[in-house]
From Swiss-Prot:
This is E1B protein, small T-antigen. Belongs to the adenoviridae E1B 19 kDa protein family. Coiled coil: none annotated. It comes from Simian adenovirus serotype 7. The keyword Transit peptide does not apply. Pfam families: Adeno_E1B_19K. The keyword Flavoprotein does not apply. The lineage of its organism: Viruses, Varidnaviria, Bamfordvirae, Preplasmiviricota, Tectiliviricetes.
Amino acid sequence: MDLRTALQTFESTRRLLELCSNRTSFLWRWLFGTPLSRLVRQVKLEYEKDFERILDQCPGVFESLELGYHKVFEEKIVKELDFSSPGRAVAAVAFASYLLDRWNTRTHLSPGYQMDYISLNLWKFWLRRRVYNYSRGLPQLGPAAPLARQGSQQEEQQQRQEEEQVQEEMRSGLDPPTEN
């Protein structure tokens, strides 16, 4: 199973995250897991300290998720995920799995909600990035040709501004005001 297939649908993205998380036993992962899920799990375990340092730079992420404020998570975590190459995409999925494990230890929300929320954000961001690359004529992430980082910083900045405009239009009004 390649990475593009694993992120193609919400269900497959959710299954991949579930197989990589700590809530899946070793035996279940070994019997029913895919090589990709084992790879993502291995990356998650190897880079655990780096992921922890990243989370230390974003204080209040889990507290805001507990209160139902998702803007902090979407702006500080999801927008910084990188799918420009297969290795970076695996690292992004590993980081999402790490977030799921950390959120599990600190919450009163149901495990299904947590899994759905992180899977949905990962899947939506991957789709947005894929559509953006397709509209710009950039190669897609796939087994034949890894996506090389192309385009200037100006294009990336323009894309972020477009995403911010879309996010502002879609806000439900539940998020607290942000400090600039």
